[in-house]
Amino acid sequence: MLPGVPYLRRPRIRLVVERVLGVARARLGVRVVHYSVQGNHLHFIVEALDKPALARGLQGLAIRLAKAINGTLGRRGKLFADRYHSRVLKSPRETRSTIRYVLHNGPKHALERGEVTPEGALDTYSSARFFTGYADRDPMLVERAWRSTPDPPVCRAQCWLLKTGWKRTGLLRTNELPAP
């Protein structure tokens, strides 16, 4: 994000991001599997067929998000400082660490600021409620989240690493924070 963009972890911004992801998910050419809204940036884990599809899809997503977030904040102009940063996930361990980072980065920063969050509480500014890989969360709650959301902001993973491969290194726990 550009300097001067207001703090993004607000309910209105989260709803806008989820709405954009829900509407755009079938049109982007990429599949957003996990996301989180941070204070001044967004995290996504996506599946794409190739680099050109990834570039086109994320460019389209950035445009849609910028228009929607700017509209919500009552501002105009460029929102994102630069293009996205990407990394191809290559191993089950790296994939598990990345999922943990994206879904649990908000609570990690809250803890660093001295904020108290309930044990095992999910980050409401992420796609954690749609995540099926928690060892300590009832799978029926996840299925209920999928069924009760007409246009979910994320897609179910299709590639082996994001769907099952990462589980070889152990399911996540809701209170498991990213490494410092």
Residue ranges and their predicted role:
Residues 5-40, 47-180:
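Short Pro-Cys-Gly-centered "Cys-loop" motif that presents a nucleophilic cysteine in a tight turn
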Residues 1:
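Active-site-flanking beta-strand signature of metal-NTP-handling nucleotidyl enzymes
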